[in-house]
Amino acid sequence: MSRDSIFAAARVLVAAGPVAGVLGAWRRRLAGLALLAAAAAAPAAQAETQFFSLSDFQFEDGTVMPELRIAYETQGRLSPERDNAVVLLHDALSDRHAFDALIGPGRLFDTDRYFVVTPDAVGGGESSSPGDGSGQDFPRYTIGDAMAADYALIARGLGLARVRAIVGRTMGAFIGLEWAVRHPEMPQRLVLLAPTARSDANFRLLIDLMTSAIALDPDWAGGRYERNPVEGLRHAGRIYYPWSVTRPYLERIVEDALAEESEASAKAFASWDANALVLRYAACREYDAIGGRGTEPPAALAPAAMPVLLIASAGDRLIDPHDARRLAAALPQARYVEIPGDLGHRAIAAPPGTPAGEAIGGAIAEFLK
C-alpha cells in the first residue's frame, strides 16, 4: 500500500466515526491516526527492485513488443521445496508497494514463512508503460496481457511451477482470476479482494466519464501531449472519489473532510502519466473472464478448482458485492466474506489496526493456514 493511500485510509477511518461537528477535534484525530497508519505502512525491510525482461512479447491484439520489462520485488526466502511463494497483485491506481504494510516478519504475509513476490503490473510503476516515452504508441493491453506477463515472471523469471497463493486486489483480483482460469496448475490458493468475473455497465460508464474528463483538458492533444494534462487527471480523480465510498458515508462526514478527500483523490490521479492511466482503466473496462457479456460464469470458471477466498465490501459502488457473491457461487471451492460498514470500495485497502483491515487480515490468515 502506498503512503498516500495509507493517509487516505486514515482519513476514511476518522470520518467513519461519529461526527462531532467540531472540525478541530476531527483534525486532531486525523493527525494521530495518520501517524499510526504511516508507521504501520513502513515495510519491515527495504526490498531491492529487480527487473525481468520478456523478448518479443505478444499482446492479445497481436502487437509485439521487442522487450517488455516487469519490475518486481521479493521478500523472505524461498523454501528448499520451492513451495512457499505468495504473489501479491495490486489495484489499478497502485504499484508493487500496495501491500507494504502487510509484508514482513510477523505480519500477514510473514517473510519468515513466505517468499513474497510483488510485481508492478504492465503499464505502470517501473514496468514498461506509456510513461516511458511511448505514449499513445504503447500497446492497448488487456487484463489477460497483464496476467501473461506476471505469469512469465513467476514461471520463467523465478522458475516456479507452483505458488502457495496468489492474492489480488480489484485489478489484481481481475488478474488473479484470469491466472486461475488459464494456469490453474500454478496457484494452490487464490485470494480475491473486491472481485468480479467481468466489468459491469456501471463500472464501464464510470471509466468512460473519467477518460472523457482527461480528454477535455486542452493539454491532452489527442494523447500526444507535450505537457501532462494534469487538470484533466484531477477532474477524473474528483469523478472517481464519490464512487469509492458509500452514499451514507458521504452524507455524514463534515464538509471540509469531504472536500479534502475529493482533492486527495484528484492529487492521486494527477500523479499518473495520462496515457498510462487511460490505458490502465481501458484494460479494466474491457475485463471479462467469462467470455461474453450476458453469459453465466460456471463453465468458463471451471478450471479454477483450487480453494478461493473472495472478500467484498458492503455497499461497494465500484465492484458490486452481488457480483462477488455470484462469482463465489460459480467457483468449485469458494469461501465468501463480506466486510460490513459504509466505507464502500475503500474498505478493501483499509490498513492494519482498523476494523476493516483487521477483518480482512483475519480472513486471509485463516484461509492461508
Feature names for model-found ranges:
Residues 304, 310-312:
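Short beta-strand/loop motif that positions the catalytic acidic residue
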Residues 317-323:
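Conserved alpha/beta-hydrolase "acid-adjacent" motif
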